[in-house]
């Protein structure tokens, strides 16, 4: 497992494209607006190192045969679910902020079970692919952004009936070695602090929407991926010189970003759903 320092250094090695207030941020890790949220995620690594919290923050993984950070775990029992909630309470007590790894953890379990059902009914190999992906995540102790929410556009219309087809993430090309996708995921908690984006559908779909029924994973610095960092009223006080008041939680925080996918290639081994529209609702649930 990574230490807090190793996690921070791993973010520095990423070639992220992050825009804030109309400008490309050269160093997201040390940016005063982003650093508090990064500190929250780093706390999940820090507490996993401490002996007094290891029963909550870490767990044995049957996939790789060693202890892992619980945020990378596939739930095996009722006890796992209880300890998940206890871990979240502990993180809330330590940060008083959003620690940004909950949706990724839930996505692991939703996709793991849904891909199993898909393989059983359709004879696909999505579950095998996702199992291998989970081994990769656990071995490398990665923070993964579970990305579900699309911009949506006109919410009275289905994905395929939108005036702008990019309002929902969709497949634009299927190749022998993978797929090309385009669209965006909105309000992505902790996206800038994540090593990977794990994409899921956002609504149940009909056959006419099949190009939008996709699930896949890409590195957060994959070619064609960029993020627009969100902000709230008065939060730029953190950027003011010698600011020492009205900063809210100055040490810890959360953030959301719009993650844009501009014709991003995804290799087959990282595709976990492609046009199996009848399973989109199951994955969402």
Model-found features: residue ranges?
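N-terminal-proximal low-complexity accessory segments that begin disordered
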Residues: 1-47
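General beta-strand structural signal in soluble alpha/beta enzymes
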Residues: 20, 146-148, 180-182
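Glycine-rich loop at the start of a catalytic domain that most often binds anionic cofactors/ligands
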Residues: 31-35, 61-71, 160-162
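Acidic, aromatic-enriched beta-alpha/helix-loop junctions
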Residues: 39-55, 211-217
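A generic secondary-structure signal for well-formed alpha-helical elements
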Residues: 45, 49, 137, 141, ...
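Internal helix-loop-helix
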Residues: 46-144
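A short, Trp-centered hydrophobic/proline-enriched beta-strand micro-motif
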Residues: 141-154
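FAD-binding core of flavoproteins
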Residues: 151-285
């Amino acid at each position: 497992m990574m230490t807090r320092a190793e996690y921070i250094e791993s973010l520095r090695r990423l070639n992220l494209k992050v825009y804030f207030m109309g400008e490309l941020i050269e160093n997201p890790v040390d940016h005063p607006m982003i650093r508090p949220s990064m500190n929250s995620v780093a706390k999940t690594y820090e507490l996993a190192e401490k002996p007094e919290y290891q029963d909550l923050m870490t767990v044995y993984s049957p996939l790789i045969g060693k202890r892992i950070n619980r945020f990378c775990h596939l739930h095996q029992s009722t006890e796992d679910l209880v300890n998940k909630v206890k871990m979240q309470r502990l993180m809330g007590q330590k940060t008083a902020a959003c620690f940004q790894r909950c949706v990724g953890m839930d996505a692991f379990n939703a996709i793991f079970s849904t891909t199993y059902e898909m393989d059983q009914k359709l004879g696909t190999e999505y579950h095998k692919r996702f199992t291998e992906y989970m081994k990769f995540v656990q071995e490398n102790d990665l923070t993964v952004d579970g990305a579900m929410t699309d911009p949506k556009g006109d919410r009275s219309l289905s994905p395929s009936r939108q005036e702008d087809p990019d309002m929902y993430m969709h497949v634009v090309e299927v190749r022998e070695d993978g797929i090309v996708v385009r669209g965006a995921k909105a309000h992505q908690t902790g996206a800038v602090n994540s090593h990977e984006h794990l994409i899921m559908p956002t609504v149940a779909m009909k056959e006419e929407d099949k190009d939008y029924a996709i699930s896949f994973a890409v590195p957060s610095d994959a070619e064609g991926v960029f993020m627009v960092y969100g902000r709230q009223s008065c939060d730029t006080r953190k950027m003011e010189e010698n600011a020492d008041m009205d900063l809210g939680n100055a040490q810890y925080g959360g953030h959301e970003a719009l993650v844009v996918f501009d014709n991003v290639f995804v290799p087959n081994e990282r595709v976990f759903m492609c046009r199996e529209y009848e399973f989109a609702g199951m994955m969402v649930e």
